[in-house]
């Protein structure tokens, strides 16, 4: 068993998850994603699906934020840090009905989530995101991506990711286009301190 396989279970613990991401340069990555792609506005209603321990919360403007994650340890950490600041966190899996009952959002985030989902599950996520958005709202996804001419190191690291469904740009777009007509894709290879290709999709309802 290689190093990456050995650390996968450890990353389910919030403290190690955050340490690992800090080492990779997650702070700079978060700022870039928020300022250049998510672009939240003060007063926005934001749904963060697979929010983890709430790492994006400190970078957001004053907003109505709801984070959902199935990992209870992540949610406990997020509530302890940010629950007193008017941010809500729910420990649950996400379904169309559960999100439908929450009302409309200006922004739906799914950061590092699609590559953990099979195609049918990913389609359900896009469908859920589309239906959770108000008219003109946006769903932003961020995931590792295979591209032609990719460095062998980047391709290898993606192949060893905890998520077993890293896709090509075309495959991600095919899933998103079943629910969204307007999609703005962006490829970045400069967001982390390791060789890594990231695909950002901005999907507009």
Model-derived features with residue positions:
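A conserved beta-strand element that flanks and buttresses the S-adenosyl-L-methionine
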Residues: 109
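Class I (Rossmann-like) S-adenosyl-L-methionine-dependent methyltransferase catalytic domain
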Residues: 1-45, 49-101, 117-124, 128, ...
């Amino acid at each position: 068993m290689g190093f990456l396989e050995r650390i996968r279970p450890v990353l389910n613990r919030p403290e190690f998850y955050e340490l690992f991401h800090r080492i990779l340069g997650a702070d700079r990555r978060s700022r870039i994603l928020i300022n250049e792609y998510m672009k939240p506005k003060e007063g926005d209603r934001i749904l963060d699906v697979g929010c983890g321990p709430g790492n994006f919360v400190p970078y957001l403007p004053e907003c109505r934020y709801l984070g959902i994650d199935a990992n209870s340890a992540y949610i406990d950490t997020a509530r302890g840090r940010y629950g007193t600041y008017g941010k809500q966190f729910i420990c649950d899996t996400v379904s169309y009905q559960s999100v439908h009952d929450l009302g409309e959002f200006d922004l739906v985030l799914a950061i590092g989530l699609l590559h953990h989902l099979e195609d049918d599950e990913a389609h359900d996520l896009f469908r859920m995101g589309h239906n959770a958005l108000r008219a003109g709202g946006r769903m932003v996804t961020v995931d590792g991506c295979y591209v032609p001419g990719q460095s062998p190191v980047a391709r290898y690291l993606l192949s060893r990711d905890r998520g077993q469904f890293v896709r090509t740009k075309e495959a991600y777009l095919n899933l998103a286009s079943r629910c969204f007509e307007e999609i703005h894709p962006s490829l970045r290879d400069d967001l982390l301190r390791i060789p890594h290709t990231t695909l950002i999709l901005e999907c507009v309802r």
